[in-house]
Curated annotation (Swiss-Prot):
Its main location: membrane. This is Potassium-transporting ATPase KdpC subunit. The system is composed of three essential subunits: KdpA, KdpB and KdpC. The gene is kdpC. GO terms for molecular function: ATP binding; P-type potassium transmembrane transporter activity. It comes from Caulobacter vibrioides (strain NA1000 / CB15N) (Caulobacter crescentus).
Length: 197
């Protein structure tokens, strides 16, 4: 009987070591050597080396002097542990009510301007760090007014932050909200009254 079990036990032990230990360590080693930033979460640090966020996960910016990301379906404030879409269909009453509320708030902010779709819709993961260039330009008047700078300067900053589709055709042009807000702070620091509030 043991002679029948031996090949299975040896195979299980071999593949456990090979696929459960050797392969993950090899992949981790290659990733750390070839792509250390990406392997560690694409973290963004400030001048003091403090982590301020990730280029891959959105975060909440609620103040008027900052660009706001897409709404998040991943819990309160881009909670990565709750990552997922809302799974609400287009006729779901809760979704319709949220869209109407968000659209009304955005219309009050920019009356008479068409609202970009990604300003009111969540992404599939609920953690999207990017917005469309149209969404960023939609927010430019509010940000410029709150910062006390010309809108054309804010729009030029947006244009400089636009990332083109991968290989020219995969995806859509996009703007990383954290990178844009950091560039905004570097170029036009918040007014003294805004720093603490």
């Amino acid at each position: 009987m043991l002679s029948h079990l031996r090949p299975a036990l040896v195979s299980m032990g071999l593949f456990t070591v090979l696929l459960g230990l050797a392969y993950p360590l090899a992949v981790t080693g290659v990733a750390q050597a070839a792509f250390p930033n990406q392997a560690n979460g694409s973290l963004i640090r400030d001048a003091d080396g403090k982590v301020v966020g990730s280029a891959l996960i959105g975060q909440v910016f609620a103040k008027p002097e900052y660009f706001h990301g897409r709404p998040s379906a991943a819990g309160a404030g881009y909670d990565a542990s709750a990552s997922s879409g809302s799974n609400m269909g287009p006729l779901n009453e809760t979704l319709i009510a949220r869209l109407k509320t968000d659209a009304a708030a955005l219309r009050a902010e920019n009356p008479g301007v068409a609202i970009p779709a990604d300003a009111v819709t969540t992404s599939g993961s609920g953690l999207d760090p990017d917005i469309s260039p149209a969404n960023a330009r939609f927010q430019a008047p509010r940000v410029a007014g709150a910062r006390g700078v010309p809108e054309k300067d804010v729009t030029a900053l947006i244009d400089a932050q636009v990332q083109q589709p991968l290989l020219g055709f995969i995806g859509q042009p996009r703007v990383n909200v954290l990178a844009l807000n950091r560039a905004l702070d570097a170029r036009y620091p918040p007014l003294a009254s805004q720093k603490d509030g």
